A protein has these predicted regions:
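Beta-lactam-recognizing serine transpeptidase/beta-lactamase-like catalytic domain environment
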Residues: 1-33, 38-265, 277, 281, ...
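Short, gly/Ser/Thr-rich active-site loops of penicillin-recognizing serine hydrolases
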Residues: 178-186, 276-337
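Active-site loop architecture of trypsin-fold serine endopeptidases
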Residues: 268
Length: 338
């Protein structure tokens, strides 16, 4: 866990307040499309959505004075894996509404995303959640706007998505530490089958989607980009971004989750002026994994191993393969009015 800029712990009084601020557990941020991991898992685990289902993303969704649109519009029906791979806000919002507001609240509560974490750090912050959770809140929260959490909230929740479906309260104490005397909360949040599907989706983003720059040769990285405009003086500022990439590896049997979040990054010549998660945060994750995996003694994984491919390839039960048949329209009619 790191928060930059940092300071000399032997001389804290000399450090500016900004340097003493622990962004990993004290800062709360709208973490954008990283939340699509939770929405996809929630929809799949509910039984109301399958990997084969499709959603109409042809037009933006208008709710009152709000318009939900896509950064890279495909303007067609998308399957669930395509919604995730193309990071469609429209498709994700419709998946959330298929489950409903009450279902979303319960799901995020179970992941610890709506309350302060019990981690052993006194500065750990409370998330910011809507006072009134309306349908428009359900839709925007589905893609990580309208809710602000700490980076530790996000990493602990993503761990549950990829580890087989069990949420474990985060701790900074080693399991065998004499100081670790209390039993940490732990409970199942999704099925093992849904967790396996989430691993497929996250690997898909790195292989074919917006997260290609996060890959690290031999370590089967999977993940999700997240780019959110910051709220400044009560309005979202288009040029002030929180850019993130959250990853797990190796995706055939995840051992670690890594999150990199940059506060107001600037585009460069190398990023063609872009400052989004896929351009600025994903390469950080790639470098961290490439350097830490050998230190941790993790063996490299052969991505072409048939067993690995069977675990991570998306077929029909899931799409995104060229020349496959069109996805089945999402069951139910409630979404048509949004």
């Amino acid at each position: 866990m790191a928060s930059l800029p940092d300071y000399d712990p032997m001389r804290p009084a000399e450090a500016p307040a900004d340097h003493r601020f622990n962004r990993a557990v004290q800062g709360v941020y709208e973490l954008g499309s990283t939340f699509k991991i939770f929405t996809s898992a929630m929809a799949l685990d509910s039984g109301r959505v399958t990997m084969r289902d499709g959603v109409d993303t042809t037009d933006p969704i208008r709710v009152g004075r709000f318009t939900i649109s896509d950064f890279h519009p495909q303007s067609r029906w998308l399957s669930v894996p395509e919604i995730f791979m193309y990071s469609s806000n429209i498709g994700t919002a419709r998946l959330a509404m298929a489950v409903g507001t009450e279902g979303q609240q319960k799901f995020l509560n179970n992941l610890g995303l709506t309350q302060r974490l019990s981690v052993e750090l006194p500065e750990a912050a409370n998330p910011i959640v809507p006072k009134t959770w309306r349908d428009v809140s359900t839709m925007t929260i589905s893609y990580g706007h309208g809710i602000a959490v700490t980076p530790m909230h996000l990493t602990s929740a993503v761990s549950a998505m990829v580890n087989g479906g069990v949420w474990n309260a985060p701790t900074i104490l080693a399991a065998n530490s004499p100081d670790n005397t209390h039993k940490l909360p732990s409970h199942r949040v999704i099925s093992e089958q849904t967790s396996a599907q989430v691993r497929q989706l996250m690997r898909l983003v790195v292989e074919h989607g917006t997260g290609g720059r996060a890959d690290a040769d031999g370590y089967l990285v999977g993940g999700k980009t997240g780019t959110a405009e910051k709220a400044v003086n009560g309005r979202y500022a288009e040029r002030s971004l929180i850019s993130s990439f959250v990853a797990a590896f190796p995706m055939n049997d995840p051992k670690y989750v890594v999150l990199a979040t940059l506060d107001e990054p600037k585009g460069t010549k190398d990023t063609y002026g872009y400052a989004t998660g896929g351009w600025v945060a994903a390469p950080v994750v790639s470098q961290v994994i490439a350097e830490m995996a050998p230190i941790l003694g993790l063996p490299r994984v052969n991505a072409d191993d048939p067993k690995v491919r069977r675990a991570l390839d998306i077929r029909f039960d899931g799409p995104v393969i060229e020349n496959e048949p069109e996805p089945t329209p999402l069951r139910g009619t409630r979404l048509a009015s949004y």
